[in-house]
């Protein structure tokens, strides 16, 4: 299994680091005693390969210091071994431990959540049937549904032990209405129709795509968006894990502008998105959808 990277930039920088590490002579296990007249050894952080040539790699404002702070420090001791990332391990020499990447992660597998109703008997959740499956259409802000971490596009596999495959939207809403106010047990799969794309701003603060009414309409040639495979005819669901569905383009651009250098978009194909939100008014999406920044 190959090593995984959040973005193409991370992959390329990681390859440079690994190539330089392999080319560097291995240090002997037993270090000879040096005469006092010789210069002292460089600090351990300088044992990393020289990454100065990456200063403006792929249009990024990328310095050796920025890359090295995202790498594991070499441990103290006489025996030092340079290790490569293991198969299936995610490594991010450029993105580092970016919170946006973590918040946007679409986890594999399924999980169980316990939902309740508020004092009005509401969960703050709307469901929509798509291709014989049941999906989250709307999560209202400051409701039980938002507090348990449900997101637009999550697939509901079971409600209180009943399989939801083949259910209509009406049957799903009826089941929620009849469910206990104290505890509703759901089995959920994270957003199967969506995927994430991690990109990096260039020196002018751009990642290289344009949106119209929340939909990606063009991608700039040679940009980080193009390099990382961002597609047109997809809607932006999240920016760094924050839901932006129903927001005006101006607000989405403001969120992108004020974000850090690493941008992770969660996107969904137009045909799926438009089916998911049919019969929902734009005002409902704009004013009631949970647009808060999720916990990691």
Curated annotation (Swiss-Prot):
Alphabetized CDD domains for the sequence: PDZ1_syntenin-like, PDZ2_syntenin-like
Signal peptide: none
SMART domains with a match to the protein in the record: PDZ
Key word Membrane present: yes
Primary location group: cytoplasm
InterPro entries: APP-Binding, PDZ, PDZ_sf
GO MF annotation, one: protein homodimerization activity
Sequence ranges assigned to domain PDZ in this UniProt record: 112-191, 196-271
Membrane-spanning intervals of the chain: none
UniProt keywords, alphabetically: Cell membrane, Cytoplasm, Lipid-binding, Membrane, Nucleus, Repeat
Localization, UniProt: Cytoplasm; Nucleus, Nucleolus; Nucleus, Nucleoplasm; Cell membrane
Gene Ontology CC annotation, any one: cytoplasm
One GO term of the biological process aspect: cell population proliferation
Pfam family, one: PDZ
Subunit structure and binding partners: Monomer and homodimer. Interacts with SDCBP. Interacts with TM4SF1.
Domain-level remarks: The two PDZ domains mediate the interaction with phosphatidylinositol 4,5-bisphosphate (PIP2) and target SDCBP2 to the plasma membranes and nucleoli, PIP2-rich regions.
UniProt function note: Binds phosphatidylinositol 4,5-bisphosphate (PIP2). May play a role in the organization of nuclear PIP2, cell division and cell survival.
The protein's name in its UniProt record: Syntenin-2
Originating species: Rattus norvegicus (Rat)
Gene: Sdcbp2
